């Protein structure tokens, strides 16, 4: 194992849930204002995951007061304190950039239904 690979392995987080584009997440972000620190929740749909290892990022999109807001988070950053999965989305693409042009119900992502075991 190379030196950089071992450094990357030390920096990886183990508490990251498995999520994919189309899923709706609550991302708890650590915000520092002066000498105070608080947690802010950003809830929206994952429109992309990119990269791998320590450098992996994901982008979450939400519509706030009629304006589309996207934030890109480093997956293994200490700024992200917690990631919660709200719903699983059923999409056929890895990058959901087409949601930027859609409005209203057209921008809604179908929810993935788990098969019922009988």
Swiss-Prot record:
Gene3D superfamilies: 2.30.30.790. One of its GO terms (biological process) is translation. GO terms for cellular component: cytosolic large ribosomal subunit. Keywords: Ribonucleoprotein, Ribosomal protein. The keyword Kinase does not apply. The keyword Membrane does not apply. One of its GO terms (molecular function) is structural constituent of ribosome. PROSITE patterns: RIBOSOMAL_L19. Coiled coil: none annotated. Pfam families: Ribosomal_L19. InterPro entries: Ribosomal_bL19 (IPR001857), Ribosomal_bL19_CS (IPR018257), Ribosomal_bL19_sf (IPR038657), Translation_prot_SH3-like_sf (IPR008991). Belongs to the bacterial ribosomal protein bL19 family. This protein is located at the 30S-50S ribosomal subunit interface and may play a role in the structure and function of the aminoacyl-tRNA binding site. This is Large ribosomal subunit protein bL19. The lineage of its organism: Bacteria, Bacillati, Actinomycetota, Actinomycetes, Frankiales. The gene is rplS.
């Amino acid at each position: 194992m190379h030196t950089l690979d071992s450094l990357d392995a030390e920096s990886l987080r183990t508490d990251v849930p498995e999520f994919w584009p189309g899923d709706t997440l609550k991302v708890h972000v650590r915000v520092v204002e002066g000498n105070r620190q608080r947690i802010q929740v950003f809830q929206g749909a994952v429109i992309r995951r990119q990269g791998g290892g320590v450098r992996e990022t994901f982008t979450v999109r939400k519509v706030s007061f009629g304006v589309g807001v996207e934030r890109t988070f480093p997956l293994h950053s200490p700024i992200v304190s917690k990631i919660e999965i709200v719903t699983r989305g059923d999409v056929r693409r890895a990058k959901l950039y087409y949601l930027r042009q859609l409005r209203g119900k057209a921008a809604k992502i179908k929810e993935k239904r788990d098969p019922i075991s009988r």
